[in-house]
């Protein structure tokens, strides 16, 4: 009976394409390509893609990458069995542009688009499925975790101008999932108006759409510095020790 309910639920869920942002410059890694760094003998990007491959809610994967990495990433997808990857496309001049280019290549069947940082290799299929399920209900959803440190606003010279209430702050993660037409319109608007956005939720918020947050995962960190890679290795080792 439980299996039957699962099949019915699967049949009714919307088609979801994951858009993987993998065209960054890795400037904070000292020129090293973060996505091709090995994490327990597997490239960071491949760990991210494997989680999307295993997530029941993801039907298709489109990757936006640097032009010089297109062939390598396509080859790695075949090597690691990323069968959901339909296309690897050239990224744009900014993250926003890259995600839009990937979105335009998504299947016409896609009702939801899930934007995933390529450099979040510890994201889990469980979290991915939870965010997609939330977005299917409300149209725009993302994972986030409470901010632990005290945050200060400062001037360009470093003078403190304020201390936001930490209880109202959240650190955003990915995947960030949206109705397909909504995300494409939001990204197009941000680009046309030359408005810098640091995540896809920001672009959607500009259009007046409410984005709902669900509990994220503290282990779902983004690899942007060598220290992040060291922490990720420790988390992965602990995960493997638990299994």
Language model: regions and residue ranges:
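Acidic helix N-cap motif at the loop->helix transition within catalytic regions
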Residues: 71-76
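Structural beta-sheet core signal
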Residues: 18-20, 63, 115, 140-143
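Active-site nucleotide-sugar/metal-binding loop of Leloir-type enzymes
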Residues: 97-112
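SAM-dependent methyltransferases
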Residues: 1-19, 23, 54, 199-201, ...
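N-terminal glycine-rich phosphate-binding loop and ensuing alpha1 helix
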Residues: 2, 7-70
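Conserved core of the sugar-phosphate nucleotidyltransferase
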Residues: 122-214, 243
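Conserved donor nucleotide-binding strand/loop of the catalytic core
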Residues: 80-93
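Residue-level signal for inorganic ion chemistry
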Residues: 20, 45, 102, 116-117, ...
């Amino acid at each position: 009976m439980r299996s039957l309910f699962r099949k019915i639920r699967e049949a009714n869920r919307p088609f979801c394409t994951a858009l993987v942002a993998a065209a960054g410059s890795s400037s904070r890694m000292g020129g090293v390509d973060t996505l091709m760094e090995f994490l327990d003998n597997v490239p960071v990007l491949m760990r991210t893609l494997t989680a999307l491959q295993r997530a029941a809610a993801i039907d298709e994967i489109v990757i936006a990458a640097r032009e010089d990495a297109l062939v390598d990433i396509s080859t790695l997808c075949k090597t690691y069995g990323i069968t959901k990857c339909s296309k690897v496309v050239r990224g744009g001049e900014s993250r926003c542009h890259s995600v839009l280019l990937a979105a335009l290549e998504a299947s016409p069947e896609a009702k939801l688009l899930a934007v995933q940082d390529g450099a979040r290799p510890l994201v889990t299929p469980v979290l991915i499925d939870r965010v997609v399920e939330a977005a299917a209900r409300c149209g725009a959803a993302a994972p986030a975790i409470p901010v632990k440190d005290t945050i200060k606003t400062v001037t360009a010279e470093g003078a403190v101008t304020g201390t936001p209430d930490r209880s109202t702050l959240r650190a955003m993660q990915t995947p960030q999932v949206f109705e397909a037409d909504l995300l494409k319109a939001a990204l197009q608007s941000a680009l046309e108006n030359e408005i810098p956005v640091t995540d896809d939720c920001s672009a959607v918020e500009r259009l007046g759409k409410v984005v709902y947050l669900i509990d994220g995962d503290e282990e779902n960190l983004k690899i942007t510095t060598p220290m992040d890679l060291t922490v990720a290795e420790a988390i992965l080792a602990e995960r493997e020790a638990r299994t």
